[in-house]
Amino acid sequence: MENLQPESVSRETLIAQYFPGQIEAIQRYADFLVGAGIERGLIGPREGERIWDRHIFNCLPITQLLPEGASLFDIGSGAGLPGIVIALARPDVKVTLIEPLERRVEFLNEVVAAISSDLIEIEVIRGRAQDVKKSANFITARAVA
């Protein structure tokens, strides 16, 4: 996969490059972030304008490092970044979103239901990472204190 940079090509080109077959789903997710994500305080009110560059495209570099068929935990998933982006860009990767707060889990479940397809595998677990009784090949955490 060619390594395209957000500042050198159009948003549509990047979406087509990194989300083949998932274009509608990633756009639906971006809409969720800008709408319900801001309303529920999962992302800041000024983040809507930069949702693609600062949040979605920022999650893409790791997708090129994951081997085919890997499993991944996204700890403290919050609004689903980077876990949902990884799942949509790499449908072969099984992604588990781990989040302790109920309101965030509700948001994640709504997003997963809205973007789900037979091509992607995303599981949402309410809990703390140390309490999860499963394992994964890789772990991500973004803005976790």
Predicted features along the sequence, with ranges:
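Short beta->alpha connector loops
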Residues: 144-145
